[in-house]
């Protein structure tokens, strides 16, 4: 994931920052508790495509 692109992207739900998880190929929104997939290097920032994060994944 291009770091410059990552700096521009925000969560479509909360407008907060996203953190890239290289291992899982996801963009994480801690405030929305969602993980957006990255497919073929392209972020899919659709709420309907995101998965809900567990407390364990959020470190809670």
From Swiss-Prot:
SUPFAM superfamilies, per database record = Trm112p-like
Q: Superkingdom, according to UniProt?
A: Bacteria
Gene Ontology CC terms: cytosol
Against Gene3D superfamilies, the record matches this protein to:
2.20.25.10
HAMAP family per the UniProt record, alphabetical: UPF0434
The record's similarity note reads:
Belongs to the UPF0434 family.
- What is the name attached to this protein's record? UPF0434 protein Bpro_2950
Report the source organism.
Answer: Polaromonas sp. (strain JS666 / ATCC BAA-500)
Taxonomic lineage of the native organism: Bacteria, Pseudomonadati, Pseudomonadota, Betaproteobacteria, Burkholderiales
